[in-house]
Amino acid sequence: MADGRNLEKVKELAAYRVSEEIYVEEMDSRAMVLEHIKSGARIFLMSNEDENKVFYIGFRTPPDDSTGLPHILEHSVLEGSDKFPVKDPFVELVKGSLNTFLNAMTYPDKTVYPVASCNDKDFQNLMDVYLDGVLHPAIYREPKIFLQEGWHYELESPEDELTINGVVYNEMKGAFSSPESVLDRFTRNVLFPDTTYSNESGGDPAVIPQLTYEKFIAFHRNYYHPANSYIYLYGDMDMAQKLTWLDQEYLGHYDRKDCHADSAIATQQPFEQPVQREITYSVTEEEGTKDRTYLSISTVVGTDLEPVLYVAFQILEYTLINAPGATLKQALIDAGIGQDILGGYDCGILQPYFS
């Protein structure tokens, strides 16, 4: 049984305001939603006896173009910080920490930085490195981080052609070479033409070179603020101690500001009639074009704030497409409609959709 006393001490912390507290029976966890009063940061705690402790901080990072700014920033903030001025602290943590999970992910509308460890001292250090990275990154004094992770020109000799290089630029060239990936991204862009989802948060290689260092810095200054963040703590730990440390080392140094108007995600209004679009992708001469056509049918399904609908479509996705011998998938294959049937329920954005 999760120890409720762990969260009783949290209620006594003057730096925080508790807005909700519940017991989650399925996970034997006591959960609490809080707000850091000075900075406006939101925190969700799940206290239980799981020794695998989890922390993440996430920011709403809606892109207004397809330069891949959120993705490049995700790479860049873990390239050194004020407190940890080493070249690549992320790699050092991969090699030298006791982490059970360590990553950073860019989504179409948010960027998250999760870590986990069973060792409390190691867990505390992981939190420190990640928080200093996202809030106090070296990008302000080291423009070369942007050039390395984003894009830059290269010229080996005067006789060579000018080329473009960069970690994210090359990564997204690879992503855009996959027809399934191209179709998935294009589907989302077409379904939500009037919202941030019409842009490619990961970056379109054709557009990435339009990103400037000045816009890159402005994006971090605007969105990477505690008031635009959500912090998550899970597992067997002294929650009051962790929150006190968060306040003293990081959150308490920030004043609340209104980030929500800029980072708010607009809702796409329904189309008056079904929309059809076509897109092409590259193939080699050896591959040819025979049997290389893809067809996708997608529909928006409510919002991610509807838990019953969410569960229903998770079940439908498994039953119709992903289960062994799934009925819809097998029927389509038997009818000769396609060589293979892919699909599913994408529920990682404000308006989930089924394809």
Regions picked out by a protein language model, each given a short descriptive name:
Residues L45-T61:
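Active-site scaffold of zinc-dependent metalloenzymes
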Residues I22-V24, T284-E287:
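Short Gly/Pro-enriched turn/cap motifs at secondary-structure boundaries
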Residues A2-A14, P62, S66, S76-P270, ...:
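Charge-rich, well-structured scaffold segments of protease-associated domains
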Residues A31, G40-I43, V54, D184-F186, ...:
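Short glycine-rich loop/turn motifs
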Residues A31-I37, V275-E285:
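Short acidic-hydrophobic surface loop/beta-edge motif
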Residues E21-Y23, F59, P63, T67:
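Short, N-terminal intrinsically disordered low-complexity segments that are rich in Pro/Gly
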Residues A2-E49:
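N- or domain-start disorder-to-order transition segments that initiate the globular core
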